[in-house]
Structure formats: C-alpha cells, structure tokens
C-alpha cells in the first residue's frame, strides 16, 4: 500500500545520524530541559529568523500558551478558520475564549482576508491564520488589518515549516508562530513536539513560564500554567532533521511539480499556488469535480491510500457547533470538503509510487 504520508521515511533517510543522537541522549544525564532543547530552540530561531523559540509539547499547546501569554480569556473572541486541524480551535476553546469562524479562499484554501475585518469587534483579541498544506496566507493584508486594529496575529505553521511569504519564513511575520513536529510533518520527531517563535521578549518569557506551571526563576507560580515541554530526545532528533529541512522540502516541491505536469484528467484540478509563496507541500491536495468518494475507493483498491484534509470542518463537529454564528458564511469551507483529496506526498516517496499515482489518476473515470 502507498500511503499519502509515511513517517518512517523521514527516519530511514537519516537513520545513522538519528540513532547516534538518540544514543547520546540515552547515555546523558538529562532527559528534560537540557542542551539539546536549548540548541534546537536556538537553531530554529536562526532558521526562521526570530529572536526567540520555545519548545513545547505539541502545536496545540503552542497555540494555547501563546493565547494565554497574550492575555486571551473567557469573554474574548479569536478569529480563525474552520478548515483546519481541530487542535487550532481546541486551543482557543481551552482559554475560555470564543472561536469566531470565517470562510476561506476558494482558490488557496487559506483564510479569506475580506471576511476577517467583517468579524472584528471590541471582543476580538487575536487572529489566528492557518498556513494550510504548506502554503502561506495573504500576510500583507493580514498584517495591515493587525496594524489598523492593534490585534496580534498568531501564525499556525503546523504544516508549513520552511515555507516563505515574499522571501520571509512563515512564523516570523506575525506576533507569534506556532509549529508542529508530529511524525507526518515536513520537520518531524518520533512523537509529539511543538514550538512557538516570537520577537517579543515579554511573550517569550510568558510562554516559557506558562509551559512550566507558571513558574518564575524561583519556581514560584505567578500564573496558573501547565506542563508542556519539548523533551531532549525529540529535540536531538529535530536538530538532525532541521539541517536537511530545505533539502526535504525541495524534494516535496519536485514531486508536486511532477504531479502538476503529469496528472491530466478533466475531472481533477491541481492546487493553486500563490505567486508570493514558497509552498512546501506538506500535503498535495487535488480537487475532484465529480466522484470524489469513488476516486478514493478506486485508489485504495489499486494500492494507494488517499486522505481527506479535512472531511469534517471544525464548526460541524459536535463540541464546536455552538460557536457558529448565524451570520457566519462558510460557503467555501463547506464546498471544498466535498471535493478535496490528499494524494501521496512525503520526502522519500519512490518514483514508482509517484508514477503509479499519476497513472491511476489519469485513468480515473466516473463512467
């Protein structure tokens, strides 16, 4: 079976270095908050182009802690999209704030900036933009809105490690950037891991404190925090993989280029790419004009496991339905989930698997 993602490939490619890094941690005296985490935080800041990075347990925690650091609380509102991983919205709800869903662009599937300003009011405290599938949002427009209203921007970069907008790395443009190192991601560890980036010293120190019970340097909890840390083992692995992230992303781009030039079926549309974005293709998501479910079944019968990201938007999920405002217009969000399909995309994907995927998609018919 050929899967749309294969985490093991990221290990096999650099197994010798990764095994050595794991062994070094196991024989060290520090498994939590040691030199590997500090090194990775520094390396990642240098890579992204921010002053500070804070390793945390996962991307959901990164967003939650960032919201808390900004001061988001019950009664506040946070604008974001419904077409995202549930964790984006779970982090908002976790603070007691209300997520306000806005629609996405039908072209790029990123946040529709025209809808953002319509939903801003006195309760709006943060806007979370999601760089979905590895593609940047329209950050110029978002930052203009941010400046106009004085609203902080959190970049959800969970799927966009290494991506750029007008030459700048995502995660360095907003107030805070939040990253995931889940095993399927472009930059991945072998468990859960996340990180927040910022240029604001106060936010850096606040996120760091909140991620460790709200402690100050004397272990006196000044705020009610939580326990969310990137451990030494994951950091050691990430230090190895970060060296190769640009190379791995380039491999994804090459696969995407081959798909775009070789898949030629009137029923299938390729993902649009913004001219201002260096797209790193965490996922390659096609749109099927007719027979989407039939296509998925057809691929599976022929040894290819395709996915849907995401089959159920967050506002349709039971726990979050109550947050949908009567005035919310999520037409594009609800439209695209009926047609999108994620086809195989990961560094290490073999040519024979790529070619098989292309051939099967070109042969697909609803007849």
What are these language model-derived features?
Residues 1-30, 35, 302, 344:
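N-terminal "arm"/small-domain region of PLP-dependent enzymes with the aminotransferase-like
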Residues 179-180, 194-199, 239:
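Short beta-strand-to-turn element immediately C-terminal to the catalytic PLP-Schiff-base lysine
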Residues 155-190, 205, 217-222:
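Conserved active-site segment immediately N-terminal to the catalytic lysine
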Residues 54, 79, 100, 152-154, ...:
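Structural detector of well-ordered beta-strand residues that form the stable sheet scaffold
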Residues 59, 96, 156, 186, ...:
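Conserved G/P- and acidic residue-centered "switch" motifs that form tight phosphate/ATP-binding loops
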Residues 8, 35-42, 47-53, 114, ...:
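PLP-dependent aminotransferase class I/II
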Residues 29-77, 83, 91-95, 101-103, ...:
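Phosphate-binding glycine-rich loop
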Residues 68-157, 164:
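PLP-dependent aminotransferase-like
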């Amino acid at each position: 079976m050929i899967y749309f993602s294969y985490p093991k490939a990221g290990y096999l490619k650099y197994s010798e270095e990764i095994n050595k890094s794991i062994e070094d941690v196991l024989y060290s005296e520090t498994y939590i908050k040691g030199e590997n985490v500090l090194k990775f935080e520094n390396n990642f800041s240098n890579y992204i182009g921010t002053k500070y990075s804070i390793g945390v347990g996962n991307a959901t925690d990164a967003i939650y802690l960032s919201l808390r650091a900004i001061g988001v609380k019950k009664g506040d509102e946070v604008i974001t999209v419904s077409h995202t991983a549930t964790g984006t919205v779970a982090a908002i709800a976790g603070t007691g704030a209300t997520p306000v869903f806005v629609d996405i662009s039908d072209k790029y599937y990123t946040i529709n900036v025209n809808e953002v300003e319509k939903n801003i009011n006195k309760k709006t405290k943060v806007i979370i933009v999601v760089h979905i599938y590895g593609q940047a949002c329209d950050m110029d427009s978002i930052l203009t809105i941010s400046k106009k209203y004085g609203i902080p921007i959190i970049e959800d970069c969970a799927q966009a490690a290494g991506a750029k907008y007008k030459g700048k790395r995502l995660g360095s443009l907003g107030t805070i950037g939040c990253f995931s190192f889940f095993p399927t991601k472009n930059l991945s560890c072998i468990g859960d891991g996340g990180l927040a980036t910022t240029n604001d010293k106060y936010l850096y120190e606040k996120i760091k404190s909140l991620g460790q019970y709200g402690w100050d340097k004397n272990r006196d909890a000044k705020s009610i925090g939580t326990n969310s840390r990137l451990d030494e083992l994951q950091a050691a692995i990430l230090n190895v993989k970060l060296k190769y992230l640009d190379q791995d992303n380039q491999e994804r781009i090459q696969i995407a280029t081959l798909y775009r030039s070789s898949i030629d079926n009137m029923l299938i549309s390729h993902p649009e790419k913004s001219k201002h974005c260096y797209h790193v293709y965490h996922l390659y998501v096609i749109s099927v004009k007719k027979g989407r479910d039939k296509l998925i079944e057809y691929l599976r019968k022929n040894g290819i496991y395709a996915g849907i990201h995401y089959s159920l938007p967050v506002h349709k999920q039971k726990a979050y339905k109550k947050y949908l405002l009567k005035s919310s217009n999520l037409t594009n969000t609800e439209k695209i989930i009926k047609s999108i399909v994620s086809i195989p995309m990961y560094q290490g994907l073999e040519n024979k698997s790529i070619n098989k995927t292309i051939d099967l998609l070109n042969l697909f018919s609803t007849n």
